[in-house]
C-alpha cells in the first residue's frame, strides 16, 4: 500500500500540470481570438460608417461590395476636422482624432450648462470630424455634419447632408438609436427622411428655422417637417438636436461661413 503513494502523487502532479498547460493554451487562443475579433469589429464599424455617409451623400449604390464602398469613400468623401468655436478647419489628420477620448478630456471638450444642453448630450467636443462631398470634377457639392441628441429612450445619432449654400438639406440618416420601433423608430423611415430634402435650416436672417411640427407640415413651408405620429418625445429630441447643432455651440459659426461662400471654391 505504501508503495502506491508516490505513484498516486505523481499521477496527481501530472494531472495538475496538464490542467495548467491546457488553461494556458486556452488563454492564449481566447486572447488571440479576442484581438482578431476586435480588429474585425472595428473594420466593420468603419465600413458601416462609410456606407451611411455615402448613403446620405446620395452616392451609395444597391449591393455595393465592401471594396466598392471603400473606393467610393476614398474618391468622393474628404474627412476634415473642424474647430467648432471658430468654425475653421484644422490641419490635423482626422484619422488621429477620437471623439470618445475627446469627450473624456477636459482640455478637448466642454461641459454644457443646463441652459446650453438643449440636446441632452452633457459634453461637447471642441473638435468635430465632418465630411466634404466632391463631385466628378472634384468640386465640393455638399458637406455632411454629424449630429446627435437624446430621444425618448436613447441617444440618436445622425448624418445630415447640406448644400454648399449652408442652409439647404440634401439628405439625412439616423444610423444609431434605440427608439421604439414603429413610433420613434420611424426616424429611419425613408418616407420621413425624404421630407427633409430641400428644406431650409435657416431663415433669411440666418437664424435656425427648421421645425418638426405636430401632424402634417404645410406643403409650402420650406422649414417644416412632419412630426412622428405617436412619438412626440422623439420628435422633440430631433428638434432639440437641430436647435443645438445649428446654434452657436454647435455648427453655427461654421455654417455662417458656408453661407457666406466658404465652400464655393473648394
Swiss-Prot record:
Modified residue annotations for FMN phosphoryl threonine: 232
Record-listed E.C. numbers: 7.2.1.1
Gene Ontology MF terms: FMN binding; oxidoreductase activity, acting on NAD(P)H, quinone or similar compound as acceptor
Keyword Magnesium: no
Record-annotated membrane-spanning stretches: 16-36
Bilayer topology: Single-pass membrane protein
One cellular-component annotation, GO: plasma membrane
Cofactor requirements of the protein: FMN
Compartments reported by the entry: Cell inner membrane
Similarity annotation: Belongs to the NqrC family.
Identification of the protein by name: Na(+)-translocating NADH-quinone reductase subunit C
